[in-house]
Each structure stands twice: as structure tokens, then as C-alpha cells.
């Protein structure tokens, strides 16, 4: 999320570029009033505007960056993103239920937020992460990769963001937040109230699924994070 991107993450849906993004990725119904609507997600990603800043200088959350990562995975593996996810993560993690992923009208997988998964399976993946990528099948996720985003590191780009409301002493790397709360607590956050919260020192893994009306509500987040921290504090 430190890529120089002019994308506007506007969950109110007022920004033109956000409307284009959601329409061309199949997340919203196609808005006929949008001019020059991209022909699918790949077309949209290929024409993302720059913010004018140098890469690696400022944190800027942008969902299309995650979609681009999914596209990179497809190019590197010569396979569909959902196939890679299934073969390398879901099957060896012994997930119990079917999962779904959003496709654009041309069949491209939306890796930014188009995956729906059962609570039990989400907890399984979260616990796998807490256990440094290993289960009874052996090592599924490289431990070094998990340690890279769990352990504190330079957070100057994160602190340079325009509106630092979430985790003022934290950081963001590899799609996970370092909370800055101590004990190396880290988490993943989705819109409408989805959370994974991990306290490795207390061997605590929490997931939260929700259908909150607001895509983002910082006050509600702060309340839930306080609850997660207190659960950890109660553990010896």
C-alpha cells in the first residue's frame, strides 16, 4: 500500500474512479452513466493513475493494489488466482467448506475483497497464521514471511498517511496491520466489520464476522479492538 496511486478509496461511492472500479469488477451493477468504463478489472488496473509521489513514501490504502497482487500471482504461476489459493492454501489447510470468489464479467478473480468463506474456515486460516504457517500437514506458509509482517519494522510510510485514525503507533505490511499495542498483536480488517485478531504471546486467535451497515466506522473498530485486547489481558 505504499505504491504511488491516485485511486480514491471512497466507500460512499461518490468518486468517479471508485464507481468505475466497482462496476468493472462486478462488485456493483454496471452504472450506465459512467463514461469510458473499463472492460473488466485488468483493463482498470492497467490504467490506474499515479498520485505523483514517489513509490514507498506514503501509505495509501487502495483495494486495486490487492487486485493487482492477485494478477501478479496469476502471471507468476500461469494459473487462475482461485486455483492457486485452493491448491497452495485452502486444501493443505484442511478447510471444511466451499468458498466463493467474485469474478468480473470476463472471469477475472477479485482478490481484493471478493472471497466469502465460512467462519470456521476463516478461524482455521487465522490460527494457521498464529502458528507461523504450520499445521499437522507441515509448513503451509513460510514462517519467514509471517515473521516479516508480525515483527515491528520501519513504519514511517504508514505514519505519513493523510488520515491516521487507525493504529497511530502501528504499521501495515503484506495485508496485515501491526497494531502497535504490544505483545506483537496484529490483525486483518475487512469492511462492514470483519476482523482477524491475533495475540501470539497469549496464543489467542479471534475472528469477527459482521454485516454492519457502515463500511468503516472507526469508533466501532476502537470498541472492538478494546474488547480483543481485554480478552488477551485476561489470559495468563
Describe each PLM feature range.
Residues 12-106, 110-113:
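Catalytic-site signature segments of enzymes, centered on catalytic residues
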Residues 216-236:
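Short, gly/Ser/Thr-rich active-site loops of penicillin-recognizing serine hydrolases
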Residues 1-17:
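Short helix- or helix-capping micro-motifs
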Residues 85-86, 91-150:
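Active-site-proximal binding-pocket segments
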Residues 3, 7, 132, 152, ...:
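Phosphate/oxyanion-binding loops and surfaces in catalytic or ligand/nucleic-acid-binding neighborhoods
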Residues 1, 42, 46, 70-74, ...:
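Non-transmembrane alpha-helical segments in soluble domains
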Residues 95-100, 147-207, 215:
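Active-site Gly/Thr loop motif
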Residues 2-3, 65-72, 113-134, 194-210:
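Active-site-proximal alpha-helical segments within enzyme catalytic domains
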Amino acid at each position: 500500500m505504499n505504491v504511488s496511486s491516485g485511486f480514491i478509496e471512497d466507500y460512499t461511492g461518490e468518486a468517479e474512479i471508485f464507481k468505475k472500479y466497482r462496476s468493472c469488477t462486478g462488485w456493483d451493477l454496471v452504472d450506465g452513466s459512467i463514461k469510458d468504463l473499463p472492460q473488466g478489472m485488468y483493463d482498470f488496473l492497467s490504467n490506474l493513475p499515479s498520485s505523483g509521489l514517489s513509490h514507498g513514501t506514503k501509505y495509501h490504502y487502495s483495494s486495486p493494489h490487492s487486485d493487482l497482487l492477485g494478477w501478479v500471482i496469476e502471471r507468476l504461476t500461469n494459473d487462475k488466482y482461485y486455483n492457486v489459493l485452493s491448491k497452495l492454501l485452502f486444501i493443505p489447510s484442511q478447510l471444511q467448506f466451499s468458498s466463493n470468489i467474485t469474478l468480473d464479467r470476463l472471469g477475472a478473480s477479485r482478490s481484493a475483497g471478493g472471497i466469502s468463506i465460512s467462519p470456521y474456515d476463516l478461524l482455521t486460516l487465522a490460527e494457521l497464521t498464529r502458528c507461523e504457517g504450520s499445521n499437522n500437514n507441515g509448513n503451509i506458509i513460510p514462517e519467514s514471511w509471517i515473521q516479516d509482517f508480525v515483527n515491528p519494522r520501519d513504519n514511517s510510510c504508514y505514519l505519513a498517511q493523510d488520515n491516521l485514525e487507525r493504529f497511530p503507533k502501528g504499521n501495515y505490511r503484506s495485508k496485515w496491520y501491526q497494531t502497535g499495542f504490544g505483545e506483537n498483536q496484529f490483525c486483518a480488517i475487512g469492511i462492514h466489520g470483519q476482523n482477524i485478531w491475533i495475540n501470539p504471546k497469549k496464543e489467542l486467535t479471534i475472528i469477527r464476522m459482521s454485516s454492519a451497515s457502515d463500511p468503516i466506522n472507526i469508533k466501532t473498530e476502537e470498541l472492538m479492538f478494546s474488547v480483543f485486547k481485554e480478552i488477551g489481558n485476561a489470559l495468563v
